[in-house]
A protein has these predicted regions:
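Bacterial Sec-dependent N-terminal signal peptides
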Residues: 1-24
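N-terminal amphipathic/hydrophobic interface segments
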Residues: 20-209
Length: 209
C-alpha cells in the first residue's frame, strides 16, 4: 500500500517538469550590472515576476537567455493563492517552474507553516518536497518527519520516515502518514503507536482526529 502511494506521489511530482515556461520579467530593482552578450546580469534588490508569482531577494544572478536565476538573501516568493515562501537562497528555473530553496526555508499557507532547510517547490503543481527533515505546524498540531510532500491545492501532506505527530491529546509515531491541514485528520498507512494521556494504542491502518 505504501509503495503504491509513494509511486503515485513521485509520478505527480514529475508532471510538467519539462514544460516550456514564459520568460521571467524584472518588475523592479535598485541596480542592474549590465546584461552581457550571454544575457547574464547581477541585480541588486530585484523583484521578479513569473506567471502570476513574485520573487524577491537582496540580490540575484539572472541569466535571461536560460530563463533562470540564483537569488541570495531574504528570498520571498509570493503566489497568487496567498502562499508565501521564505529562504536565504533560491535557484529558480523559469522553464520548469521549479524553485529549489535552501537555508531557513519557511512556507506559509494559511494556518499551516512548513519549515525545513531544503525545499523543492514546483510552481505549476504547487507541490513542495523535502528529504532532509522538516516540520509542519498547523494550529496545535506539530508534525515532523525525514521526508515530506506538501500539496498546496488539497492541503494534504504526506510524511515518510521517523514521523511524529504531536497534538494536545496524543503523541503519534509512525513511518508513513497523510495529514490534511484543513480537516486536521491524520491517516496511517503502516505500524503506528498512539500514546494518549491514559492509554497506548497500536495500529497499522486508520485515522486520527
Amino acid at each position: 500500500m505504501r509503495k503504491a502511494i509513494f509511486s503515485f506521489l513521485f509520478s505527480i511530482l514529475t508532471v510538467l517538469a519539462f514544460a516550456q515556461g514564459r520568460q521571467i520579467e524584472i518588475r523592479s530593482s535598485e541596480l542592474v550590472k549590465g546584461f552581457q552578450a550571454s544575457g547574464f546580469a547581477r541585480i541588486i534588490r530585484p523583484v521578479f515576476v513569473h506567471e502570476g508569482s513574485t520573487l524577491a531577494s537582496d540580490s540575484a544572478d539572472f541569466n535571461q537567455t536560460a530563463n533562470t536565476f540564483e537569488a541570495f538573501g531574504h528570498v520571498v516568493i509570493t503566489q497568487p493563492s496567498g502562499t508565501v515562501i521564505y529562504s536565504d537562497h533560491l535557484n529558480y528555473d523559469g522553464n520548469t517552474k521549479l524553485a529549489v530553496l535552501t537555508n531557513k526555508v519557511k512556507l506559509i499557507d494559511g494556518d499551516a507553516t512548513l519549515t525545513t532547510d531544503h525545499l523543492t517547490y514546483n510552481m505549476t503543481t504547487k507541490i513542495g518536497t523535502y528529504t532532509g527533515g522538516g516540520k509542519i505546524v498547523n494550529g496545535k498540531n506539530v508534525l515532523t518527519s525525514k521526508n515530506g510532500y506538501y500539496f498546496e491545492t488539497s492541503r494534504d501532506s504526506y510524511f515518510r520516515y521517523d514521523v511524529v505527530l504531536t497534538s494536545p491529546d496524543a503523541l503519534i509515531k509512525t513511518d508513513t502518514l497523510r495529514y490534511n491541514s484543513t480537516t486536521k485528520i491524520a491517516y496511517f498507512y503502516g505500524p503506528t503507536n498512539i500514546y494518549g494521556k491514559d492509554d497506548t494504542l497500536y495500529t497499522e491502518n486508520g485515522t486520527y482526529n
